[in-house]
Amino acid sequence: CKILNNEKYKEFNNIYSFYKAINHFGDSFVIDSDVVIFKNIFIGRPKTSLYFLITRPKSNKEEWIPIIKKDKIDNIIVSNDYLPSLLGISYWSKSDAEKIKEHIHKFMAKNILLDNSLYWDNIPMQILSDLNVGYKELSIHDAYEIDSIEEYHFALTLNHKN
């Protein structure tokens, strides 16, 4: 584990944070800082790149929903459909990481880094057809992503049930 300093975390979106960690990317997990993990989900090394998914409680909030074809993530859409969505944890093989690294320069323009609607996941999303990305669905009792005070309180209730 290595902690990296992002001196521009207040100014730029997390694409810049990803850029700061690019030398550590590959055969590695990426865990967004707003994810709470209740159980050890890191048992065994995945054979392919994958996104961890959860099914959140029904709401009108839009989430990143993977479109799955033949056990692989074919596309990712933003929707409030009640379906499994990206959790904020992923694993990337060395070969897929190298392909993503080849595209990061396209995302380093200041106007892109200042766009709060973009995330580092936008990079692999653009080249999913060139990647081998599977998925692993978890229970909300395994991990949860916190984006609001309401979700924080919900996560506390989940933790007390574990």
Model region roles, listed by residue range:
Residues 10-12, 71-72, 126-128:
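Short, motif-level signal for alpha-helix interfacial/capping segments enriched in acidic residues
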